[in-house]
Amino acid sequence: MKIFRNSIAIAILTTLMLALFAVFAGGMTSAGAAEVKTADVKYSAVPAGEYHLDTAHSIIGFAVRHLEINWVEGRFKDFNGTINYDDKDVTRSKVQFAAKIESIDTGVEQRNAHLRTADFFDAAKYPEMKFVSTKIEKKGKGKYILFGDLTIKDVTKPISFPFTFTGAVPDPWGGTRFGIQAETVINRRDYNINWGNALPVGGFDVGNNVTVKLQLEAVKATAK
């Protein structure tokens, strides 16, 4: 009888705990849903003019395969860039940016130092990489492709970036900003970055294809 009473007590306690958890979890779900809801941002048209990259809120990054099983990501921390935006015809806009090779950062200083050597970028001889746009094509609503010349080391080759961009927003300091997101893939060996060892299973310890990722925030230049 005592065992029976204990079983009933445990069952009641378990039911109460489950009920409380359901109520609590339901509240958390509602709060969480409200917290992650996409903001209803009222963007405005991007005004024409010259824009500079806000380097504190922009990323020129990359990702490359390691041992054909994982990705190593990195970025260039010292860079600058300019966008000359044509509000009448986006395809007539111009983009250029440059990054200091010495500023490469993959989160591991020993690897960073190796990337700066002649095995890879040879920062002492070629201190900067740069991109200069040649044209922009529209590929649908809000979709564009940016074409241009990318120079790394002693090689300049044409590449293209599919990209999207936001409308403009005012910032707290009286400026106007908009964002650009772009991504493309290049072959590092096209730019004489050839270091790497073949793996017995196939492939290389450092992948040949490099994904280049741009997350750019541009602020309108102030009138001089």
Question: How would you name each of these model-derived features?
Answer:
Residues A11-G27:
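Bacterial N-terminal signal peptides
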Residues M1-A9:
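N-terminal secretory signal peptides that target proteins for export/translocation
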